[in-house]
């Protein structure tokens, strides 16, 4: 069954509120799409139907309560302005986004399931302001941080596969003293990679902490 079912349940249990669901629809016949439908072509009988999956789900949650828009300065708000012409032209206003997927480089293809920068770009622009921090708990090759950096946001990412460190460094063009320009804002960019010896245990540790929190919540 769809993993998003578990995701919604877990996020609600830990206190987040469900807000939206967006469908990312990939072009029909795209190379990264599974060809499950071919089974019926070989066996044209009932019970051999497996449709090709051409979409993925983006689920949006928020903290309880309303966002305090008054806390955002006029300057930050203006610098984070969304291009409404692009918003309309590319149909961001729909709950289904048609965006072509991308293939990871051959070097890293066995490690990651690539997604287009445009997908991250829309989400970062729609749900954060310049200067805020974007968190990606499944960093992969660093796409989220690359896009966030380009859009003037800070970014923190977690990745348990140490083999991807080289790819992350390569994509972020590590240079702690480089002076970059973000949407007309000059700032000192600092990129740091921290390696934890217990990284591979974090998944189990987090699950245990969540289960402990849920048991405590239910007992009360």
List the model feature ranges, each with a label.
Residues 1-167, 211-220:
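Core catalytic lobe of class I
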Residues 169-215:
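S-adenosyl-L-methionine
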């Amino acid at each position: 069954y769809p993993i998003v079912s578990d995701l919604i349940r877990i996020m609600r249990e830990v206190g987040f509120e469900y807000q939206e669901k967006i469908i990312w629809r990939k072009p029909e016949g795209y190379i990264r799409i599974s060809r499950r439908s071919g089974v019926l072509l070989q066996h044209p009988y009932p019970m051999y139907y497996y449709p090709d999956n051409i979409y993925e789900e983006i689920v949006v949650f928020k903290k309880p309560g309303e966002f305090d828009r008054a806390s955002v300065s006029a300057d930050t708000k203006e610098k984070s302005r969304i291009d409404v012409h692009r918003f309309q032209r590319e149909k961001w206003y729909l709950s289904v986004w048609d965006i072509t997927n991308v293939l990871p480089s051959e070097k890293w293809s066995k490690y990651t399931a690539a997604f287009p920068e445009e997908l991250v770009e829309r989400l970062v622009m729609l749900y954060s302001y310049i200067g805020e921090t974007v968190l990606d708990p499944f960093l992969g090759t660093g796409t989220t941080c690359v896009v966030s950096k380009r859009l003037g946001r800070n970014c923190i990412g977690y990745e348990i596969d140490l083999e991807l460190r080289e790819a992350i460094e390569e994509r972020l063009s590590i240079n702690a003293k480089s002076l970059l320009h973000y949407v007309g804002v000059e700032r000192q960019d600092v990129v740091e990679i921290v390696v934890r010896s217990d990284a591979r245990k974090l998944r189990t540790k987090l699950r245990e902490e969540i289960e402990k929190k849920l048991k405590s919540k239910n007992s009360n």
